[in-house]
Design a protein with these regions (language model features):
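Residue-level recognition of tetratricopeptide repeat
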Residues: 26, 60, 98, 132, ...
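Register position in tetratricopeptide repeats
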Residues: 30-31, 64, 98, 102-103, ...
Length: 198
């Protein structure tokens, strides 16, 4: 069996250690070691290991490090790869929309949000992202509708804080306060939500 694995590795040009960098990168990313994750993902990319996932991971690391333009480039490269599954594409588009928001390319962020809405089941995170994009574009009613949907899907204290923060960033604190009040007046959804409330 070992001989078969080694011969397959030699035939494909990959060695057994190829996925080591990718796996370490995923672990580093999860632990918040973004510089290390980026380095490992770049090694995985250069070795051709899981290209779409590796580009996506490098993009997330760049996003977390505040290098938004470079993150967008990695996300674009990920989307160009063969075999980008539907779930992975949704994830990449979501992250790319966030990166576009960070560089204030609101039209591009909106385009990704629209693609997500057309091709995927909307969830609380997608509603929030779409609401945040609409708010950045001064589409207050659309933002409010999306935030309502996000909070309806995920009526937790964390979600209320997230929506409040989006409004606060636009000097619209009063609009966000109602989510905090609703979260505090309701019952906790789980132990973590109860703990978040103090």
């Amino acid at each position: 069996l070992t001989a078969v694995c080694l011969s397959l590795g030699l035939l494909t040009g990959c060695n057994v250690g190829d996925t080591k960098n990718y796996k370490q990168a995923a672990q580093d990313l999860e632990q918040g070691n973004y510089e290390a994750a980026l380095e490992e993902y770049e090694t995985a990319i250069s070795e051709g290991v899981k290209p779409a996932q590796s580009y996506r991971g490098a993009g997330v690391a760049k996003l977390k490090l505040g290098n938004y333009e470079e993150a967008i480039t990695y996300f674009n490269d990920a989307l160009k790869c063969d075999k980008v599954g539907k779930a992975l594409k949704k994830d990449i588009l979501s992250y790319r929309a966030v990166a576009y928001l960070k560089v204030k390319d609101y039209e591009a962020a909106l385009e990704d949000c629209q693609t997500l809405a057309e091709n995927y089941k909307m969830d609380a995170d997608l509603y929030f992202l779409t609401g945040e994009t609409a708010l950045a574009m001064d589409s207050y009613e659309e933002a409010s509708a999306n935030f309502e949907q996000a909070y309806g899907e995920d009526a937790t204290y964390d979600r209320a804080i997230q929506i409040y923060g989006a409004y606060l960033n636009r000097d619209m604190e009063a609009d966000g306060t109602r989510y905090l009040e609703a979260a505090l007046s309701g019952t906790a959804k789980n132990a973590e939500d109860h703990c978040d409330r103090g």
